[in-house]
Amino acid sequence: MNRPIAESFLNRADHRVLRRILLPLSLWHLLNLEIAKSPYFFGNTFPLVKDLRIAVTICTTLFPQLPDFSQKRLMGDWLRSWRCNFLTETAKFRCYLEDFNALPQLWKKPEIRPSGERESVGLPWALAIVTSVCGSTGWSAETVWNMPVGQAYWYHVAFAMQKGCSVDLLSEGEMEAIERVRAKKAKQ
């Protein structure tokens, strides 16, 4: 069996960061992390304590609720977690992200666009996945937005393949070869 498939359907349910139990990482959480410009989503800067508290608040909120960023909530989070070691909690949050981020590994075809041609803008990726899975299954938007991200993405890819889309998944051997090359480059 393809390792990312197994990883996306077999997740730990005991992720706890800043003494709060996190929900399975969902498209709703990723959308909110993106909107909040979270360093945990973009990875462009090292997160601050405030970034971790915001990310934890987001990842404890179900669709369609909005995360509670009120001063009262953030102060309560601070009081509950002020003795926590920030680096340890950040490592735990990154472990949580990695546990649920088991997406299909696809071969990407190079895009060749004539010079001067306008870049096309499609649906935001999270919305595209939600509409695809809802349209293919009849499941409610709430069910799909709250579904673990790996599962939703795998369903999306599977339905696309069933509809005849050309999707080229990486094999186990190809993924291992890519990992070996990355490890070799990292040592250089």
Can you say where each PLM-predicted feature lies in the sequence?
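An amphipathic, hydrophobic-aromatic interaction surface with interspersed Lys/Arg
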Residues: 1-50, 54-63, 73-167
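Extended accessory and catalytic-adjacent subdomains in large enzymes
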Residues: 68-71
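Accessory, usually C-terminal, subdomains that scaffold auxiliary metal cofactors
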Residues: 159-188
